Amino acid sequence: MPSRPEWVGSCNCSICRRLGTLFAYYPAEAGIRIEGETARYVWGDRMISLHHCPTCGCPTHWEPIVEGIDKVGINARLLDGFAIDGPRYLLNGDELEVRYLDNAG
């Protein structure tokens, strides 16, 4: 992770709702590196690929597969130091803003 995210997104699209992910967003050019192999699922509208661990199935990140999307998402729930403190979300003890995203269409 290149830096602490400013916020994490709680998306209400069909797959994020079901998986319970909270994504930390970074610019596509941020140089995010994922260690180890992942399996991928190409989401319904074929704009992003959602990656998950082939062993345990945890969603790890998503990345764009079309031009024009300038960010990537990392599953914040997998970050060391990430905790949920009641209605607050924390990363290494510091509060993170959660924005509720209406992407259900």
Where would I find each of the regions flagged by the language model?
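A short Gly-Trp-Pro
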Residues: 1-105
